[in-house]
Design a protein with these regions (language model features):
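Short N-terminal helix-initiation segments at or just after the protein's N-terminus
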Residues: 122, 126, 157-159, 185-193
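Enzymes that bind and transform nitrogen-containing heteroaromatic metabolites
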Residues: 2-18, 22-46, 62, 82, ...
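Helix-turn-helix
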Residues: 50
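Short, surface-exposed recognition loops or helix-turn segments adjacent to catalytic cores
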Residues: 152-157, 222-224
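Zn2+-dependent cytidine deaminase-like catalytic core
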Residues: 53-155, 300-302
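Flexible, polar/acidic helix-loop-strand segments at domain edges
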Residues: 160-168
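Active-site beta-strand termini and strand-to-loop segments that position acidic
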Residues: 55-56, 168-169, 362-364
Length: 386
Protein backbone atom coordinates (compact mmCIF):
# COMPACT_ATOMS: atom_id res chain seq x y z
CA UNK A 1 0.00 0.00 0.00
CA UNK A 2 1.20 3.47 -0.75
CA UNK A 3 -0.32 6.84 -1.48
CA UNK A 4 -2.55 6.77 -4.51
CA UNK A 5 -1.49 8.63 -7.60
CA UNK A 6 -3.99 10.41 -9.75
CA UNK A 7 -3.20 8.31 -12.80
CA UNK A 8 -4.28 5.17 -10.97
CA UNK A 9 -7.38 6.51 -9.29
CA UNK A 10 -9.80 5.56 -12.02
CA UNK A 11 -8.67 1.94 -11.90
CA UNK A 12 -8.52 1.84 -8.13
CA UNK A 13 -11.90 3.32 -7.26
CA UNK A 14 -13.79 3.44 -10.55
CA UNK A 15 -14.04 7.20 -10.40
CA UNK A 16 -14.93 9.23 -13.46
CA UNK A 17 -12.65 11.96 -12.16
CA UNK A 18 -10.41 12.04 -15.18
CA UNK A 19 -13.11 11.78 -17.82
CA UNK A 20 -15.33 14.54 -16.46
CA UNK A 21 -17.04 17.25 -18.43
CA UNK A 22 -15.91 20.83 -18.07
CA UNK A 23 -17.20 22.82 -15.12
CA UNK A 24 -17.96 26.53 -15.01
CA UNK A 25 -16.38 29.18 -12.80
CA UNK A 26 -19.20 29.17 -10.24
CA UNK A 27 -18.97 25.41 -9.84
CA UNK A 28 -15.20 25.61 -9.45
CA UNK A 29 -15.57 28.31 -6.80
CA UNK A 30 -18.10 26.21 -4.90
CA UNK A 31 -15.77 23.20 -4.93
CA UNK A 32 -12.89 25.29 -3.60
CA UNK A 33 -15.14 26.43 -0.76
CA UNK A 34 -16.15 22.82 -0.11
CA UNK A 35 -12.50 21.71 0.02
CA UNK A 36 -11.68 24.50 2.47
CA UNK A 37 -14.61 23.46 4.66
CA UNK A 38 -13.61 19.79 4.52
CA UNK A 39 -10.14 20.60 5.84
CA UNK A 40 -11.72 21.84 9.09
CA UNK A 41 -12.98 18.38 10.00
CA UNK A 42 -11.27 15.89 12.32
CA UNK A 43 -9.24 13.06 10.86
CA UNK A 44 -9.93 9.48 11.81
CA UNK A 45 -12.17 6.63 10.73
CA UNK A 46 -14.13 8.93 8.41
CA UNK A 47 -12.84 10.99 5.47
CA UNK A 48 -12.70 14.78 5.39
CA UNK A 49 -15.73 15.97 3.43
CA UNK A 50 -17.13 19.42 2.65
CA UNK A 51 -20.26 20.51 0.79
CA UNK A 52 -21.71 23.75 -0.56
CA UNK A 53 -25.36 24.26 -1.51
CA UNK A 54 -25.64 26.56 -4.53
CA UNK A 55 -28.84 28.40 -5.38
CA UNK A 56 -30.33 28.65 -8.85
CA UNK A 57 -28.77 32.12 -9.14
CA UNK A 58 -25.28 30.80 -8.32
CA UNK A 59 -25.12 32.11 -4.76
CA UNK A 60 -23.76 29.91 -1.95
CA UNK A 61 -26.74 29.16 0.29
CA UNK A 62 -24.85 27.14 2.91
CA UNK A 63 -21.52 25.42 3.53
CA UNK A 64 -21.16 22.29 5.63
CA UNK A 65 -18.54 19.75 6.63
CA UNK A 66 -18.35 16.49 8.55
CA UNK A 67 -17.37 17.07 12.18
CA UNK A 68 -16.70 13.45 13.12
CA UNK A 69 -18.31 10.07 13.68
CA UNK A 70 -21.97 10.28 14.63
CA UNK A 71 -22.40 13.88 13.47
CA UNK A 72 -24.21 15.06 10.36
CA UNK A 73 -22.40 14.38 7.11
CA UNK A 74 -21.27 17.37 5.08
CA UNK A 75 -24.26 17.29 2.73
CA UNK A 76 -26.77 16.98 5.57
CA UNK A 77 -24.96 19.73 7.48
CA UNK A 78 -25.16 22.13 4.54
CA UNK A 79 -28.77 21.24 3.74
CA UNK A 80 -29.75 21.65 7.39
CA UNK A 81 -28.16 25.09 7.57
CA UNK A 82 -29.88 26.20 4.37
CA UNK A 83 -33.27 25.01 5.59
CA UNK A 84 -32.76 26.67 8.98
CA UNK A 85 -32.16 29.93 7.11
CA UNK A 86 -35.44 29.49 5.25
CA UNK A 87 -33.86 28.76 1.88
CA UNK A 88 -35.85 27.05 -0.84
CA UNK A 89 -33.64 24.23 -2.14
CA UNK A 90 -35.88 23.09 -4.97
CA UNK A 91 -33.81 23.14 -8.15
CA UNK A 92 -30.62 23.98 -6.25
CA UNK A 93 -27.25 22.28 -6.69
CA UNK A 94 -24.88 20.79 -4.15
CA UNK A 95 -21.12 20.56 -4.65
CA UNK A 96 -19.36 17.90 -2.55
CA UNK A 97 -15.75 16.75 -2.20
CA UNK A 98 -16.75 13.05 -2.03
CA UNK A 99 -19.56 11.02 -3.59
CA UNK A 100 -22.67 11.28 -1.38
CA UNK A 101 -23.05 8.16 0.74
CA UNK A 102 -25.79 5.60 0.21
CA UNK A 103 -25.97 3.77 3.52
CA UNK A 104 -27.62 4.07 6.92
CA UNK A 105 -24.92 4.25 9.56
CA UNK A 106 -25.22 6.49 12.59
CA UNK A 107 -26.76 9.04 10.22
CA UNK A 108 -29.06 8.58 7.24
CA UNK A 109 -27.88 8.27 3.63
CA UNK A 110 -26.86 11.59 2.11
CA UNK A 111 -28.15 10.62 -1.32
CA UNK A 112 -31.69 10.38 0.06
CA UNK A 113 -31.31 13.65 2.00
CA UNK A 114 -30.37 15.38 -1.25
CA UNK A 115 -33.37 13.91 -3.05
CA UNK A 116 -35.75 14.83 -0.22
CA UNK A 117 -34.46 18.43 -0.22
CA UNK A 118 -35.44 18.88 -3.86
CA UNK A 119 -31.87 19.41 -5.06
CA UNK A 120 -31.61 18.54 -8.74
CA UNK A 121 -27.90 18.91 -9.52
CA UNK A 122 -25.00 17.17 -7.74
CA UNK A 123 -21.31 17.68 -8.43
CA UNK A 124 -18.72 15.69 -6.51
CA UNK A 125 -14.95 15.34 -6.78
CA UNK A 126 -14.21 11.62 -6.37
CA UNK A 127 -16.06 8.35 -5.86
CA UNK A 128 -16.37 6.88 -2.37
CA UNK A 129 -14.17 3.74 -2.24
CA UNK A 130 -15.79 2.53 1.00
CA UNK A 131 -18.11 -0.28 -0.15
CA UNK A 132 -20.88 0.20 2.46
CA UNK A 133 -21.14 3.91 1.59
CA UNK A 134 -20.64 3.74 -2.17
CA UNK A 135 -23.41 3.91 -4.73
CA UNK A 136 -24.85 7.31 -3.94
CA UNK A 137 -24.44 8.49 -7.51
CA UNK A 138 -26.50 5.57 -8.82
CA UNK A 139 -29.31 6.30 -6.36
CA UNK A 140 -29.32 9.98 -7.26
CA UNK A 141 -29.45 9.34 -10.99
CA UNK A 142 -32.27 6.84 -10.52
CA UNK A 143 -34.23 9.63 -8.81
CA UNK A 144 -33.70 11.96 -11.77
CA UNK A 145 -30.93 14.04 -10.22
CA UNK A 146 -28.22 15.29 -12.57
CA UNK A 147 -24.87 13.93 -11.31
CA UNK A 148 -21.38 14.90 -12.44
CA UNK A 149 -18.00 14.02 -10.95
CA UNK A 150 -14.32 14.85 -11.32
CA UNK A 151 -14.23 18.51 -10.33
CA UNK A 152 -10.98 19.25 -8.41
CA UNK A 153 -10.38 15.50 -8.15
CA UNK A 154 -6.65 15.78 -7.52
CA UNK A 155 -7.13 18.23 -4.64
CA UNK A 156 -9.84 16.05 -3.11
CA UNK A 157 -7.66 12.97 -3.39
CA UNK A 158 -4.72 14.74 -1.80
CA UNK A 159 -6.94 15.84 1.08
CA UNK A 160 -7.81 12.23 1.91
CA UNK A 161 -5.13 10.21 0.16
CA UNK A 162 -3.94 8.50 3.35
CA UNK A 163 -7.53 7.68 4.27
CA UNK A 164 -8.17 6.27 0.78
CA UNK A 165 -5.10 4.06 1.09
CA UNK A 166 -6.08 2.88 4.56
CA UNK A 167 -9.58 1.92 3.40
CA UNK A 168 -8.17 0.06 0.39
CA UNK A 169 -5.61 -1.87 2.45
CA UNK A 170 -7.78 -2.27 5.57
CA UNK A 171 -4.96 -1.04 7.77
CA UNK A 172 -3.69 2.39 8.83
CA UNK A 173 -1.50 4.39 6.48
CA UNK A 174 1.90 4.38 8.19
CA UNK A 175 4.17 7.41 8.34
CA UNK A 176 7.56 6.65 9.86
CA UNK A 177 9.28 9.62 11.49
CA UNK A 178 13.01 9.80 12.24
CA UNK A 179 14.95 12.72 13.73
CA UNK A 180 18.64 11.97 13.24
CA UNK A 181 22.16 13.30 12.84
CA UNK A 182 24.17 13.22 9.63
CA UNK A 183 25.64 9.89 10.73
CA UNK A 184 22.19 8.42 11.40
CA UNK A 185 22.20 8.66 15.20
CA UNK A 186 19.02 9.32 17.17
CA UNK A 187 20.80 9.64 20.54
CA UNK A 188 24.32 10.07 21.90
CA UNK A 189 26.17 7.32 23.76
CA UNK A 190 24.89 8.63 27.11
CA UNK A 191 21.30 8.46 25.86
CA UNK A 192 20.77 12.20 25.39
CA UNK A 193 18.70 13.17 22.38
CA UNK A 194 16.96 16.46 23.27
CA UNK A 195 17.23 18.07 20.99
CA UNK A 196 18.90 16.76 17.86
CA UNK A 197 16.34 18.59 15.74
CA UNK A 198 16.01 22.34 15.26
CA UNK A 199 13.06 24.25 16.80
CA UNK A 200 11.62 24.56 13.31
CA UNK A 201 11.73 20.78 12.82
CA UNK A 202 10.12 20.22 16.20
CA UNK A 203 7.33 22.65 15.29
CA UNK A 204 6.79 20.87 11.98
CA UNK A 205 6.58 17.53 13.74
CA UNK A 206 4.04 18.83 16.24
CA UNK A 207 1.94 20.20 13.38
CA UNK A 208 2.01 16.72 11.81
CA UNK A 209 0.95 15.19 15.13
CA UNK A 210 -2.11 17.40 15.01
CA UNK A 211 -3.12 15.91 11.64
CA UNK A 212 -2.71 12.20 12.37
CA UNK A 213 -5.00 9.79 14.19
CA UNK A 214 -2.42 8.02 16.36
CA UNK A 215 1.25 8.06 17.26
CA UNK A 216 3.11 4.87 18.15
CA UNK A 217 6.26 4.19 20.16
CA UNK A 218 7.67 1.13 21.90
CA UNK A 219 7.60 0.48 25.62
CA UNK A 220 11.35 1.05 25.78
CA UNK A 221 10.92 4.62 24.51
CA UNK A 222 8.28 5.25 27.18
CA UNK A 223 10.52 3.88 29.94
CA UNK A 224 13.68 5.71 28.84
CA UNK A 225 12.44 9.01 27.36
CA UNK A 226 9.07 9.37 29.15
CA UNK A 227 7.54 11.27 26.18
CA UNK A 228 4.18 13.07 26.23
CA UNK A 229 3.47 12.38 22.53
CA UNK A 230 1.11 15.35 22.30
CA UNK A 231 0.73 18.01 19.62
CA UNK A 232 2.11 21.17 21.25
CA UNK A 233 2.57 24.82 20.36
CA UNK A 234 5.74 26.91 20.61
CA UNK A 235 5.13 27.39 24.34
CA UNK A 236 5.09 23.64 24.91
CA UNK A 237 1.36 23.53 25.60
CA UNK A 238 -0.97 20.91 24.12
CA UNK A 239 -2.96 22.52 21.34
CA UNK A 240 -5.67 21.40 18.96
CA UNK A 241 -6.69 17.86 18.16
CA UNK A 242 -4.57 15.30 20.01
CA UNK A 243 -3.65 11.92 18.51
CA UNK A 244 -4.28 8.62 20.22
CA UNK A 245 -1.06 7.71 22.01
CA UNK A 246 -0.23 4.05 21.36
CA UNK A 247 2.51 1.97 22.96
CA UNK A 248 3.65 -1.35 21.51
CA UNK A 249 5.34 -4.06 23.59
CA UNK A 250 4.86 -6.43 26.50
CA UNK A 251 6.34 -4.38 29.30
CA UNK A 252 3.98 -2.41 31.49
CA UNK A 253 3.55 1.36 31.39
CA UNK A 254 4.15 3.11 34.74
CA UNK A 255 1.07 4.81 36.18
CA UNK A 256 2.96 8.09 36.40
CA UNK A 257 4.28 7.99 32.82
CA UNK A 258 3.83 11.30 31.00
CA UNK A 259 2.17 9.52 28.10
CA UNK A 260 -1.03 9.08 30.12
CA UNK A 261 -1.63 12.85 30.12
CA UNK A 262 -4.74 14.44 31.52
CA UNK A 263 -7.10 12.73 29.07
CA UNK A 264 -5.73 9.19 29.40
CA UNK A 265 -6.08 8.70 25.64
CA UNK A 266 -3.55 5.85 25.60
CA UNK A 267 -3.72 2.41 24.03
CA UNK A 268 -1.26 -0.31 25.10
CA UNK A 269 -0.76 -2.91 22.37
CA UNK A 270 0.63 -6.04 24.04
CA UNK A 271 2.38 -7.34 20.93
CA UNK A 272 5.70 -7.19 19.12
CA UNK A 273 4.14 -7.86 15.72
CA UNK A 274 3.61 -4.69 13.65
CA UNK A 275 0.84 -6.33 11.62
CA UNK A 276 -1.08 -7.25 14.75
CA UNK A 277 -0.58 -3.73 16.08
CA UNK A 278 -1.98 -2.25 12.86
CA UNK A 279 -5.00 -4.56 12.98
CA UNK A 280 -5.79 -3.40 16.51
CA UNK A 281 -5.31 0.26 15.63
CA UNK A 282 -7.50 -0.03 12.53
CA UNK A 283 -10.24 -1.56 14.70
CA UNK A 284 -9.94 1.52 16.93
CA UNK A 285 -10.68 3.79 13.97
CA UNK A 286 -7.07 4.76 13.22
CA UNK A 287 -6.51 5.46 9.53
CA UNK A 288 -3.24 7.43 9.71
CA UNK A 289 -0.52 6.29 12.10
CA UNK A 290 2.84 7.90 12.78
CA UNK A 291 5.55 5.61 14.14
CA UNK A 292 8.16 7.59 16.10
CA UNK A 293 10.47 5.00 17.60
CA UNK A 294 12.77 3.85 18.98
CA UNK A 295 15.09 2.05 16.63
CA UNK A 296 13.63 -1.41 17.24
CA UNK A 297 10.09 -0.44 16.39
CA UNK A 298 11.18 1.66 13.40
CA UNK A 299 13.16 -1.29 12.07
CA UNK A 300 10.36 -3.77 12.73
CA UNK A 301 7.90 -1.79 10.60
CA UNK A 302 10.44 -1.29 7.82
CA UNK A 303 11.48 -4.95 7.80
CA UNK A 304 7.84 -5.98 7.56
CA UNK A 305 7.28 -3.70 4.54
CA UNK A 306 4.59 -1.75 6.38
CA UNK A 307 5.83 1.82 5.93
CA UNK A 308 4.05 4.01 3.38
CA UNK A 309 5.83 7.29 3.98
CA UNK A 310 9.16 8.39 5.47
CA UNK A 311 9.68 11.78 7.08
CA UNK A 312 13.29 12.31 8.16
CA UNK A 313 14.55 15.39 9.98
CA UNK A 314 18.27 15.51 9.25
CA UNK A 315 20.37 17.66 11.58
CA UNK A 316 23.86 18.92 10.52
CA UNK A 317 25.40 17.16 13.50
CA UNK A 318 27.91 14.33 13.90
CA UNK A 319 28.17 12.04 16.92
CA UNK A 320 30.31 9.16 15.70
CA UNK A 321 28.70 6.82 18.22
CA UNK A 322 25.42 6.41 20.02
CA UNK A 323 22.06 4.90 19.13
CA UNK A 324 21.62 4.19 15.44
CA UNK A 325 18.32 5.15 13.84
CA UNK A 326 17.78 1.61 12.54
CA UNK A 327 18.63 -1.93 13.56
CA UNK A 328 19.29 -4.84 11.23
CA UNK A 329 16.63 -5.04 8.51
CA UNK A 330 17.70 -8.49 7.39
CA UNK A 331 19.20 -7.17 4.16
CA UNK A 332 22.54 -8.73 3.22
CA UNK A 333 23.01 -7.66 -0.39
CA UNK A 334 22.50 -4.39 -2.25
CA UNK A 335 20.09 -6.03 -4.66
CA UNK A 336 17.64 -6.50 -1.79
CA UNK A 337 17.92 -2.93 -0.49
CA UNK A 338 14.74 -1.04 0.24
CA UNK A 339 14.37 1.65 -2.43
CA UNK A 340 12.65 4.96 -1.75
CA UNK A 341 11.91 7.99 -3.90
CA UNK A 342 11.29 11.64 -3.21
CA UNK A 343 7.66 12.57 -2.55
CA UNK A 344 6.78 16.15 -3.58
CA UNK A 345 3.37 16.07 -1.85
CA UNK A 346 2.51 17.51 1.57
CA UNK A 347 5.18 20.17 1.87
CA UNK A 348 7.66 18.94 -0.73
CA UNK A 349 10.37 16.31 -1.01
CA UNK A 350 13.11 18.40 0.61
CA UNK A 351 12.61 21.41 2.88
CA UNK A 352 15.00 23.53 4.90
CA UNK A 353 13.73 23.90 8.47
CA UNK A 354 16.08 26.12 10.42
CA UNK A 355 19.41 24.34 10.34
CA UNK A 356 17.82 20.99 9.41
CA UNK A 357 16.63 19.31 6.24
CA UNK A 358 13.21 17.67 6.15
CA UNK A 359 13.15 14.72 3.77
CA UNK A 360 9.84 13.31 2.54
CA UNK A 361 9.94 9.93 0.77
CA UNK A 362 7.67 7.16 -0.43
CA UNK A 363 8.41 3.55 -1.49
CA UNK A 364 9.89 3.47 -4.96
CA UNK A 365 7.94 1.83 -7.75
CA UNK A 366 9.30 -1.52 -8.87
CA UNK A 367 11.78 -0.71 -11.68
CA UNK A 368 10.62 -3.61 -13.84
CA UNK A 369 6.93 -2.85 -13.49
CA UNK A 370 4.91 -0.61 -15.78
CA UNK A 371 2.42 0.23 -13.04
CA UNK A 372 2.83 2.31 -9.91
CA UNK A 373 2.64 -0.45 -7.32
CA UNK A 374 5.21 0.28 -4.59
CA UNK A 375 8.18 -2.06 -4.28
CA UNK A 376 7.89 -3.86 -0.97
CA UNK A 377 11.15 -5.29 0.26
CA UNK A 378 12.37 -6.98 3.41
CA UNK A 379 10.93 -9.84 5.40
CA UNK A 380 7.21 -10.44 5.29
CA UNK A 381 7.11 -11.21 8.99
CA UNK A 382 7.73 -8.80 11.82
CA UNK A 383 10.99 -8.75 13.69
CA UNK A 384 11.87 -7.16 16.97
CA UNK A 385 9.60 -4.81 18.87
CA UNK A 386 9.82 -3.03 22.18
Amino acid sequence: MSALNTAGVSAAFGTAAFHAAAFNAAENAAMQAALAAAAQGPRGANPLVGAVVVGTDGTHLATGYHRGAGTAHAEADAIGQAKAAGRDLRGAAIVVTLEPCNHCGRTGPCAQAIIDAGITDVIYAVDDPHDPAAGGAVTLRAAGVRVRSGLAAEAALDLNRRWFDAVAAKRPFVTLHIAQTLDSRIAASDGTSQWISSPESLADNHALRGRIDAILVGTQTVLIDNPRLTARNADGEAEGKQPLRAVMGYRGIPDDAAIHGADGNVLHLATRDPREALDQLFAHGVRHLMVEGGSRILSAFLAAGLVDELIVYLAPTLLGSGTAALDDLGITTLADAQRWEWDPASGGAVQVLGRDLRLHLRPAATPTSSDTTPHRTGADTAAGGN
